[in-house]
């Protein structure tokens, strides 16, 4: 039964993965359909990351406090309903809105599922979470190829409609198989989540407005609003009963290092690499089906590397796989920035990128949880939030650069080089994170004893 539960949450994550990669393939067609600038169309992708940013830490807390089964099912219903609505809109503004709602559902899959897996497999948590991470590239194999075929055969709306029958099957599995659990004490920091969303949204809007002469004046006001929201967030979180961002924990170097690394990782993998189909369509003149096929070697590389890393992570530790994966990503981005090469060479680069990401993902996941394993779902939500912030902001910056430069080939080259440099700058952060399984637990427990008590604890 435990492995059937693992299969249920894994299929849900795969559904989210299929949806994300299908949209990446459909993105050039959707941009042409609505006839909007790239910076506006980019919100179809970046608003999804924004929704994840707000939702993941909330759902992590909700999953820790309330029933994991109810939380998981609620997220699934929200995701499928919004996906269906996206298929019927005829306005880019409405599409962006329903993509945000879709993200509110999809953003809950990972933290709630990790909480479920951590409870079902306490003795083999590292291995099972690593295997769970390998589900993402399976969806990334199916999504681009099926999505490319759907777009070429039935139009871009079909990539949203496919979530309805698949989601219904997963919903039935969840209702039947998942175990109910008792409510625990705690509260949800909705204001904190709203302030996090405000910080990122104001920053993204400010960056978008920089691309328009008539709106540039508003950019600085939006940047100021983002800064003010940041100050309000810090002040609120210091006094919150159950803060969405525990400021005292985030002051500790290992948590700071882990989250900054995930911010950069999200900017590259969730953000910029989601624009690969748009890059291939504009620079290499590929069709939707060809763009989908281009993502196949990346997904295969992710699966193979993720499974191998998950199996041997107890032996290898965390740091050197992260160094290896980061270095390989830098090399891949450098070659992507060069003049358009042969299609075969491009496929090779995508395979190499996939292997790099496959090494990084399960390692970074477990390195974060290692710092506070008793709060696995919450830590997963915070880690995911930083990744999504990186992804959302990087898409906004990337589309601004490409639109400003004018030449897609040169614009994307600049984007790839910027991300490569950020990965090089992030290498020292790896050596501030736990070195191996078990290394962070004792330090975390000792450090947590020295942390200031929450408002709730002071009252008690």
Regions found by a protein language model. Name each.
Residues 1, 433-460:
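Intrinsic disorder in cytosolic terminal tails and internal cytosolic loops
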Residues 33-35, 67, 88-94, 122, ...:
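Helix-breaking motifs and short loop linkers at transmembrane-helix boundaries and internal kinks
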Residues 54-92:
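Conserved MFS/SLC helix-loop-helix module at the cytosolic interface between two early adjacent transmembrane helices
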Residues 152-261, 293-294:
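Hydrophobic transmembrane-helix bundles of small-molecule transporters
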Residues 78-85, 90-102, 344-352:
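Paired small-residue
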Residues 2-18, 23-27, 38, 42-47, ...:
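12-transmembrane solute porter fold
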Residues 29, 57-61, 65, 149, ...:
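Membrane-interface helix termini in secondary transporters
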Residues 101-134:
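Cytoplasmic helix-loop-helix junction between adjacent transmembrane helices
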């Amino acid at each position: 039964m435990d492995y059937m539960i693992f299969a249920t949450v894994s299929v849900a994550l795969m559904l989210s993965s299929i949806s994300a990669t299908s949209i990446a393939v459909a993105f050039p067609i959707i941009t042409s359909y609505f006839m909007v600038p790239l910076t506006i169309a980019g919100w179809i992708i970046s608003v999804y990351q924004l929704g994840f940013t707000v939702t993941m830490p909330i759902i992590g807390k909700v999953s820790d406090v309330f029933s994991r089964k109810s939380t998981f099912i609620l997220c699934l219903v929200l995701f499928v309903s919004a996906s269906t609505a996206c298929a019927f809109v005829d306005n880019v503004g409405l599409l962006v809105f329903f993509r945000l709602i879709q993200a509110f559902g999809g953003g809950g899959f990972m933290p709630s599922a990790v909480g479920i897996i951590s409870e079902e497999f306490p003795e083999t948590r590292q291995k099972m979470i690593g295997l769970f991470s390998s589900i993402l590239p399976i969806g990334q194999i199916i999504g681009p190829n099926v999505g490319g075929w759907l777009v070429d055969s039935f139009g871009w709306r079909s990539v949203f409609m496919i979530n309805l029958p698949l989601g219904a099957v997963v919903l039935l599995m969840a209702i039947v198989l998942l175990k109910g659990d008792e409510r625990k004490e705690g509260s949800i920091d909705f204001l904190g989540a709203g302030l996090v969303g405000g910080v990122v949204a104001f920053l993204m809007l400010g960056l978008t407005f920089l691309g328009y002469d008539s709106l540039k004046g508003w950019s600085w006001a939006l940047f100021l609003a983002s800064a003010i929201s940041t100050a309000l967030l810090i002040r609120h979180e210091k006094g919150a009963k159950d803060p969405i961002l525990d400021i005292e924990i985030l002051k500790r170097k290992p948590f700071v290092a882990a989250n900054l690394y995930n911010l950069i990782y999200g900017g590259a993998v969730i953000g910029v690499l989601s624009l690969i189909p748009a890059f291939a369509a504009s620079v290499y003149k590929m069709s939707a089906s060809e763009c989908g096929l281009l993502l196949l070697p990346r997904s295969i590389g992710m699966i193979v590397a993720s499974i191998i890393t998950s199996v041997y992570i107890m032996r290898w530790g965390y740091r050197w796989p992260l160094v290896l994966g980061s270095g390989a990503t830098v090399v891949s981005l450098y070659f992507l920035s060069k003049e358009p090469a042969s299609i075969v060479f491009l496929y090779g680069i995508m395979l190499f990128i996939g292997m790099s990401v496959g090494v990084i993902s399960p390692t970074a996941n477990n390195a974060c949880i290692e710092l506070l394993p008793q709060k696995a779902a919450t830590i997963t939500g915070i880690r995911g939030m930083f990744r999504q912030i990186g992804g959302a902001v990087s898409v906004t910056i990337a589309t601004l650069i490409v639109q400003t430069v004018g030449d897609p080939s040169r614009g994307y080259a600049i984007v790839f080089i910027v991300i490569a440099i950020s990965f090089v700058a992030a290498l020292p952060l790896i050596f501030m994170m736990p070195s191996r399984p078990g290394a962070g637990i004792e330090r975390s427990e000792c450090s947590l004893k020295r942390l200031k008590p929450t408002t709730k604890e002071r009252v008690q």
